[in-house]
Every structure is written in structure tokens, then in C-alpha cells.
């Protein structure tokens, strides 16, 4: 892949994701497209094969945080296939480079370029970092770009009922935010000066070649482009301070233990006008003394008497947060049989509910009254000729 292709190809468009997509979103988009265009699923389809290669190439760049950062930086500098510094560069001339010539090493600047010749280098140079024009006046620099805020992860513990029905819970978080004392400037008086080392760009050259240099964050201003004359006592001149806040978070119905919920734009505030990061809420769910959960279904174990199991009847069953339901118990119901109360389970994403799975547990009495004992004794005598274990022994012999 040539450097020209690297710069000009929009890999975000290839995968169909926004430029601020998370690693998880990029991975999900890649897997979906890779399945659809895989050569094994499209035998003889040349277009699908080319598309698969393009998708894999995009994932190789965007799926690697380091490569993605360098790709974004390179596109920001050579965005539309041409590099056009402002009039402050060198003698004030405008430079128009064709990417094909530029990365071939034969680009020449227009009038007033101030002694800059062509430069060599290919994809390896781009992966090394941003290119920055050397020579000329302060106008050659570009001010530090807006920076997206960091993502935050927090945890919340819900009761079993809250997880099933949904709940709004208070969430207290601590993060770095623009310092209120100095309005994020880092200067006590709110009037920082432009860093003389980087001339406000936030970057300094770390080596040159062919008239261009690779850049690093300025060590004097820490990449901010500004220096506090009188550092703020609260943030020590950084412009950022620890901030605590409490917000009400709506947890949707039907969440499960360990589920991660993403709230866009609720993370750390961005810098220099950049967007805020995201908030990820990890949900923990307490156990319920009666009910359990199996996917969208709830479970409950209901004890029944021997007579109810043998003769059949109606059994009342509790539900979560609602009135009880009555289930008809067929005669001869064995211990451990599961019955279903439809629509009494957990809430699904489409608003419908799963079922309540009711497991029958035959209760054996520990203390029998005289009449009950006599009745069971009579039952034993009446069924003395029956052997419930006969089939068991027969099967054991035949195995």
C-alpha cells in the first residue's frame, strides 16, 4: 500500500463507522462486513474479494490504536490530497503538492518557499508521526487540535427487582475537568501567554529530513500551546482539576449482571472545544431469595403436597412485583416438573416479557398427625403390590 493510498483512502467510510467510533464498534463493523464479503461465502465473486481485502486493510489500520492515531494525524495534515500551508510559511508563498509526486520524493514548492526542496520517504515516515514544515515564520505552525475527553467507567449495584423492572439511580463520579478557578487556562488571572518554545502549536520538532520534521508534544507547555505566567493554585497550572459530580442514570429494564451500558458524552469533558468522552456503567445485580433468572425468563420453585402432586389441583404461584397467578397441576405430576406462566418474566428490549418457569417440589412432611399417618399407612397397604423401582433394576441388568 502506497503512502498516497494511506492518506487518501477513508477507512472509516470503508467500515461504515463514524470517526469517533470506539474500538468495540470498529471490531463489530469489521466482523459483520468480513462475514458478508468473505471469499468462502462468495466463490468466484471478484468484487466481493476486493471488498474483503479493502475491509481487512481498514481494520488493520483502525483496529490498531497506534496506527489509527497516525492515520488520523496524517489525514488531518494532508486531508484532501494537497498540503497548503498558510501565508506565514517562509516567504509567504502557497505550496500545492500532488500526493503522487509528494510521496514519490519529487515535490517542489512554489515561489517564496524559503529553500525547501523535495523530500523522500513513504509509509514508514507517515507511521513515524506528523510532518511539520521547518523554516519560515510562526505562521507555519498549526495550533493544537481539540481533544476528546477520556472515557469513564463506573459501577452500580441494583436489586433483583430493579434490574428486571428498570430504575433511575444516582451515580457519583470523579474525573479530571477544566479547572473552575482559572476557567481551564491554568493561569491564576486567566491570561496565559503563548508558549515561546512551540509558538503556540503545542508541538516541537524532534529531527528533520528533506525539509520536514517529525514532532513531539512541547515539553515546556505539555502540548497545550500556552504557559501560565502565574500558575493557578488549584490546578497547579495544568488547567485541569479533579471534579466530583452526581448524576441520575436511567438503567433500562431487563439488564443482566455484568452488563455494560454506554452513555455517550457523559465522560470527562474535552479540551480546547473537543467533545466529552463516554461513560460506561457496569451493572451488578443482587440475588433474590425466591426468584432466579434464565435469560429473559424468571424461575421459581414452588413446594406442593404429596396429595396435590398425586391427585392434581390448583396451585398459587407468586410473581415478581405483581399479583400471584394460579397454575393447574395435573394429576400425577412428578417432583421437578417445570410449568410455564407466560408473560411473567423479565422485560425484553422490544417491551415484551419472558415467562416465569415454575418448578414443582414435592414436600415431604416431617411430622404426621394421627389421621395423616393412618391415611398413608392405608395407601401403602393398598399399593403393596406395586414396585416403583422394578424398571430401574430391569434397566440396570440389561445395560
From Swiss-Prot:
One GO BP annotation of this record: protein refolding
Q: Where are the zinc fingers (CR-type)?
A: 166-244
Question: Which amino acids does the record list as binding Zn(2+) 1?
Answer: 179, 182, 232, 235
InterPro entries referenced in this protein's UniProt entry, alphabetically: DnaJ, DnaJ_C, DnaJ_domain, DnaJ_domain_CS, HSP40/DnaJ_pept-bd, HSP_DnaJ_Cys-rich_dom, HSP_DnaJ_Cys-rich_dom_sf, J_dom_sf
**What's the superkingdom here?**
Bacteria
> In which broad location class does this protein mainly occur, judging by the first location in its UniProt entry?
cytoplasm
Q: Where is the protein localized?
A: Cytoplasm
Q: How is the cofactor bound?
A: Binds 2 Zn(2+) ions per monomer.
- What Gene3D superfamilies is this protein classified in? 6.20.20.10, DnaJ domain, Urease metallochaperone UreE, N-terminal domain
Instruction: Give start and end of each J domain.
Output: 10-75
Tell me which UniProt keywords the record has, alphabetically: Chaperone, Cytoplasm, DNA replication, Metal-binding, Repeat, Stress response, Zinc, Zinc-finger
List the CDD domains hit by this protein, alphabetically.
DnaJ, DnaJ_C, DnaJ_zf
According to the UniProt entry, its GO molecular function terms are:
ATP binding; heat shock protein binding; unfolded protein binding; zinc ion binding
Required co-factors: Zn(2+)
Please describe what this protein does.
Participates actively in the response to hyperosmotic and heat shock by preventing the aggregation of stress-denatured proteins and by disaggregating proteins, also in an autonomous, DnaK-independent fashion. Unfolded proteins bind initially to DnaJ; upon interaction with the DnaJ-bound protein, DnaK hydrolyzes its bound ATP, resulting in the formation of a stable complex. GrpE releases ADP from DnaK; ATP binding to DnaK triggers the release of the substrate protein, thus completing the reaction cycle.
**Matching HAMAP family:** DnaJ
Q: Which NCBIfam families match?
A: DnaJ_bact, PRK14295.1
Its family remark reads: Belongs to the DnaJ family.
Q: How does it assemble?
A: Homodimer.
Read off the domain note. The J domain is necessary and sufficient to stimulate DnaK ATPase activity. Zinc center 1 plays an important role in the autonomous, DnaK-independent chaperone activity of DnaJ. Zinc center 2 is essential for interaction with DnaK and for DnaJ activity.
State what protein this is by name: Chaperone protein DnaJ 1
State the organism of origin: Streptomyces coelicolor (strain ATCC BAA-471 / A3(2) / M145)
Taxonomy, top ranks, is: Bacteria, Bacillati, Actinomycetota, Actinomycetes, Kitasatosporales
Gene that this sequence comes from: dnaJ1
